[in-house]
């Protein structure tokens, strides 16, 4: 596992966007060999999406041959519902880039047969050879996507009942009314996530410092979904200074030292031009 420690959320967003762009450019996607990108929603990735949009507008990257799979969707919300993740992704990312509508994949929370929908989603991911890079955020309790504490670390895409803490946290998107928040969602599983060739997880802020601790120093446990990333051969944790406040000083110094040559944002962006 690599841990990249940066000053703040602006820097974690830039680093993450530049990393994604680099992998896309190195991959050289074509219609026959698309780059498959896994995406999250929520507040964490917003700045990263803006940075990716900037790179697209500057002509550095293209999404023409990129296929996306989102992590999750609420059950019972139609795609045109302003609180749905379909709507979120369109308004914050997709409408600003040149991705083809048919290349966008988000679980169908309106499906009449949720189990069949989850299997269809898994099968479609596999049909493209799996996720090339999965971008993710993490909750204060360490959940990734809607894999709440206690989720099986080998779980696949499925419907999941949301915990009270998650409902409470997400109520900020529903006029701070917990009664308006759906109680069920479709989510990729931890096993689905771990099948990705690379996982890039952004962690910002003091409130998520405990999640960062369990992800980096804790034991692997189903009670902290983020800890499963320790099992992945190519996991990247992109964290700001506030998020690593619970780490041991020795751990902090180790990662700051070993990654010291890999945090120059200007150099990272300049490097992208060499792949054009």
Q: What are these model-derived regions, one by one?
A:
Residues 26-57:
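Glycine-rich N-terminal segment of FAD-binding domains in flavoprotein oxidoreductases
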Residues 129-154:
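Glycine-rich phosphate-binding loop
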Residues 145-190:
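Class I SAM-dependent methyltransferase SAM-binding "motif I" and its flanking Rossmann-like core
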